[in-house]
UniProtKB/Swiss-Prot annotation:
Gene that produces this protein: ruvB
Keyword ATP-binding: yes
Annotated region described as Large ATPase domain (RuvB-L), given as residue ranges: 21-212
Binding site for Mg(2+): T97
Cellular compartment(s): Cytoplasm
Protein name per Swiss-Prot or TrEMBL: Holliday junction branch migration complex subunit RuvB
Region annotation Small ATPAse domain (RuvB-S): where it falls in the sequence: 213-283
UniProt lineage: Bacteria, Pseudomonadati, Planctomycetota, Planctomycetia, Pirellulales
Gene3D superfamilies the UniProt entry points to: 1.10.8.60, P-loop containing nucleotide triphosphate hydrolases (3.40.50.300), Winged helix-like DNA-binding domain superfamily/Winged helix DNA-binding domain (1.10.10.10)
Keywords: ATP-binding, Cytoplasm, DNA damage, DNA recombination, DNA repair, DNA-binding, Hydrolase, Nucleotide-binding
Length: 366
């Protein structure tokens, strides 16, 4: 215990040059992020948490990933060892956090949850590491945002279950070796390419989460409608699934809005026409495009005659940042084959013109 307190104090002093500052309190971090500074007031259950599966048996989709994880979990339990470190990557909303919460349930252990953006210095990481128990899980979301200084502590923590703390400076410096209980680190990222190779290679299990099928999304909608105590028929579930961009999180968001709309407009009656009217009201069309998606395509077709046009030119015309378009708008348009990128710029496809009910220009689009 004394070594842990000395280590925490040493890391704090290295990270905080202000000698008058107070060291972090002993004990586990509160909430999901140590940077939060304390518990937030109770605002009632988070709908996303309420709808999230609690065990793997409740999960829909990603069955190949689930099967591989079941094998790894079973083998670890047979050996009586912690599960190997796991890295999940993929677009937002596909279940990375869900996996990070159900795996501890399957292993019958505890989980600490952190966010890479909140781990700004080694002193932010230390409370998590010193509070791991044997076989427990530490989940770091957005792990690609962890600074290099944090990574260096994770290397030995993941590989040797220890961290080395340098006490003092110069000729008086000495190293304190702090042993950790064997634990499982689960990382989640939407940008696996931003991870350094040394960190990426320390994950024994790496899984990429893919898009969900219409059938899988409809099943998710039907299951979660029961949790919300509303009746949704398969046809209505299909309408919601069609407009959810192959993403469970969006399907849940659409379902919550349809519930609110139905309770306000139709006394809770949910049918296909009600789902369509509810989603039309918030600008979600039958392909899942929202207002900004259609505004992008409209600008590309109306101003630039379908392209090719540069991203910056489109962004300036729409009065939207190019980062917003590149990160939030274009990925779905590209995946839906409504947009292509060429060396000369962005180009609307024939499918996009058909969807927007616009006539393609006579000149070849190249």
């Amino acid at each position: 215990m004394i070594d842990r307190l000395m280590a925490r104090e040493a890391i704090y002093q290295q990270s905080n040059p202000d000698p008058g500052g107070d060291p972090p309190e002993d004990g586990p971090p509160h909430g999901k992020n140590a940077a939060d500074g304390g518990d937030e007031p109770d605002r009632g259950p988070d709908p996303d948490v309420t709808l999230r599966p609690q065990r793997m048996a409740e999960m829909v989709g990603q069955q190949d990933v689930i099967e591989r994880l079941r094998i790894a979990i079973d083998a670890a339990q047979v050996r009586g060892e912690p599960l190997g470190h796991i890295l999940f990557d993929g677009p937002p909303g596909l279940g990375k956090t869900t996996f990070a919460t159900v795996i501890p349930s399957e292993m019958k252990t505890t989980v600490q949850m952190a966010n890479g953006a909140g781990l700004k210095a080694p002193r932010d990481l230390l409370p998590y590491l010193t509070n791991v128990s044997r076989g427990s899980v530490l989940f770091i979301d957005e792990i690609h945002r962890v600074p290099r200084a944090i990574e260096e502590y994770l290397y030995t923590a993941m590989e040797d279950f220890r961290i080395d703390i340098v006490l003092g400076e110069g000729v008086n410096a000495r190293t304190l070796n702090l042993s950790l209980e064997p634990f499982t680190l689960i990382g989640a990222t939407t940008r696996a390419g931003m991870l350094t190779a040394p960190l990426r290679d320390r994950f024994q299990i790496r899984e990429h989460l893919g898009w969900y099928t219409r059938k899988e999304l409809a099943e998710i909608v039907l299951r979660n409608s029961k949790k919300l105590n509303i009746e949704v028929d398969p046809t209505s579930a299909g309408v919601i699934a069609d407009r959810s961009r192959s993403t469970p999180r969006l399907a849940n968001n659409r379902l919550l809005w349809v519930r609110d709309y139905a309770q306000s407009k139709t006394k809770g009656n949910v049918e296909a026409s009600v789902c369509e009217a509810a989603l039309d009201m918030i600008g979600i069309d039958h392909l899942g495009l929202d207002k900004q998606d259609r505004n992008y395509l409209d600008t590309l077709m109306r101003v630039f005659l379908g392209g090719p046009a540069g991203l910056d030119a489109i962004a300036h015309t729409m009065n939207v940042s190019s980062d917003t378009l590149e990160d939030e708008v274009e990925p779905f348009l590209l995946r839906s084959e409504l947009l292509v990128r060429t060396r000369r710029g962005r180009l609307a496809t024939p499918k996009a013109f058909e969807h927007m009910k616009r006539q393609m220009p006579d000149r070849p689009l190249s």
